[in-house]
Amino acid sequence: MTHRDVFVVSTARTAIGTFGGSLKDVPNTQLATTAVKAAIARSGLAPDAVGHVVMGNVIPTDTKDAYLSRVAAIDAGCPIETPAFNVNRLCGSGLQAIISAAQAIGYGDCDVAVGGGSESMSRGPYFDTAARYGARMGDAKSIDYMLGILHDPWQKMHMGITAENVAERYKISREMQDQLACESQRRAAAAIAAGYFKDQIVPVEIATRKGTVLFQEDEHVRAATT
């Protein structure tokens, strides 16, 4: 089977929000559509040239997220005939989407594909497991889907504990971690101040009582960290 060369011709992303921050009321499908639409526009190609759309997503936040890729494709202007599918590889979901999009081109399924990912942990739902058929007797339990996904399904271990285990195994002290974290915050703040990310970011429109505002700068960076 012949494998064709694949090239990245355009990229786009939204600014990153903090947990429970400016993007907490913005649907995940809107975030995905915003990025996909901008990436297509920046490529100089028409939306009907896109032959495949692949989106990574870990935490569905709305019924539309079950077909996030297709919602983003259609709302970004792609024809209804354009194939689309979601992938879930946890933290690597967006990267896997890019790989899958590249494979679609490489093996001749299409000439143009869009690959990316969209996540809104702020909008992660709670599950009421007894709601459909009733609790019948005793207490009912509400499950934090977002927090649950951060746990290993076999050991029931939070991924934060994995970091503690790695630190212990490789003798990484708290001081070393703090130094790296502080330097990371400093670099991110400096990059934002210098405008290094502006060309990457496409603004997200947020409807407020005072009108529409544009969210276009990464929010979580703590510039004052020392």
What do these predicted regions represent?
Residues 12-15, 56-60, 89-93, 117-122, ...:
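Acidic, glycine-rich active-site loops and adjacent beta-strand->loop/helix elements
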Residues 111-166:
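Flexible glycine-/small-residue-enriched beta->alpha junction loops
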Residues 7, 13-14, 24-29, 33-34, ...:
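N-terminal extracellular/periplasmic Venus flytrap/periplasmic-binding protein-like
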Residues 89-119, 167-196:
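Active-site-proximal alpha-helical scaffold in enzymes
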Residues 1-58, 62-72, 76, 83, ...:
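Conserved active-site "lid/cap" helical segment
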Residues 2-5, 47-51, 78-83, 93, ...:
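Short coil/turn connectors at secondary-structure junctions
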Residues 57-112, 153-161, 224-226:
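Conserved catalytic cysteine-centered active-site region
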Residues 48-56, 83-88, 113-118, 178-183, ...:
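Beta-strand segments within the central parallel beta-sheet cores of soluble alpha/beta enzyme folds
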